Amino acid sequence: MSNILTEICATKARHVADKKKHISETDLYNLTKNQTAPRGFRAALDKKRAEGKFSLIAEIKKASPSKGLIRPDFEPILHARSYQEGGAACLSVLTDQPYFQGHEDYLIAARNEVTLPVLRKDFMIDPWQVTEARAIGADAILIIVAALEDNQMQEIEAAALEYGMDALIEVHSTQEMERALRLKSRLIGVNNRDLRDFSVSFDRTYELIKQAPKECTFVAESGIQTHDDLVAMNQHNIGCFLVGETLMRQKDVKQATRDLLGLN
């Protein structure tokens, strides 16, 4: 595990422990009953691909540890609407506060504004967080293989599947891909950014997709900037992408989304 990931997970563990003191899992579970059914995150990605289109998970992201503040005029509702109108298949919303200036309220607001499925982008270390994710309306959660032991991944995935949610399993290496494929989920993401030094390379993604069974929905994450990047990856049978910073830095987010997808 990288130093930054170790630090983030340690901070997350403290925050989750503190949250548990204030609300029980039973109370959280009762809140999940007030939510509409999960919208089908992976299904939405697969549908776009079946239509011969690129599948975009568009990320609502205010800041990051490596880049600092990304979007000063941060408006989750407006960004969600722009992404949907721009042609995104799904949304991803950062809810981590200390490192990404995210918040659960951003996900709630974004999901209420659109009909797209929404991923809770956070560092999941405890099944309790999955219940919390469903309680705020998330349709999918992220599992970062580098951050967890196998038994932790299995418990978190099981909690997500029990709620009818999808789990996006993020890997960075051959070894992590092998571990990911022991899980039930077949929604696999490869982070093009090396968390050790934040460098970006698509080569890792091109190699790892060779390990993925054909039934997997394979998502390329991070460092994607142009429509040409999508075209290049499509030549390697990669048609699903998670993009945040590139779009969040643009004045016209809707138009930037359309440009990225080649819809103009």
Swiss-Prot record:
Catalyzed reactions per annotation: 1-(2-carboxyphenylamino)-1-deoxy-D-ribulose 5-phosphate + H(+) = (1S,2R)-1-C-(indol-3-yl)glycerol 3-phosphate + CO2 + H2O
A molecular function (GO) term: phosphoribosylanthranilate isomerase activity
Keywords of this entry: Amino-acid biosynthesis, Aromatic amino acid biosynthesis, Decarboxylase, Lyase, Tryptophan biosynthesis
Pathway participation: Amino-acid biosynthesis; L-tryptophan biosynthesis; L-tryptophan from chorismate: step 4/5
EC numbers on record: 4.1.1.48
GO annotation terms (biological process): L-tryptophan biosynthetic process
Any one Pfam family match given in the protein's UniProt record, by short name: IGPS
Highest taxon, organism lineage: Bacteria
PANTHER family: INDOLE-3-GLYCEROL-PHOSPHATE SYNTHASE, TRYPTOPHAN BIOSYNTHESIS PROTEIN
Family classification: Belongs to the TrpC family.
Protein name per its UniProtKB record: Indole-3-glycerol phosphate synthase
Organism: Zymomonas mobilis subsp. pomaceae (strain ATCC 29192 / DSM 22645 / JCM 10191 / CCUG 17912 / NBRC 13757 / NCIMB 11200 / NRRL B-4491 / Barker I)
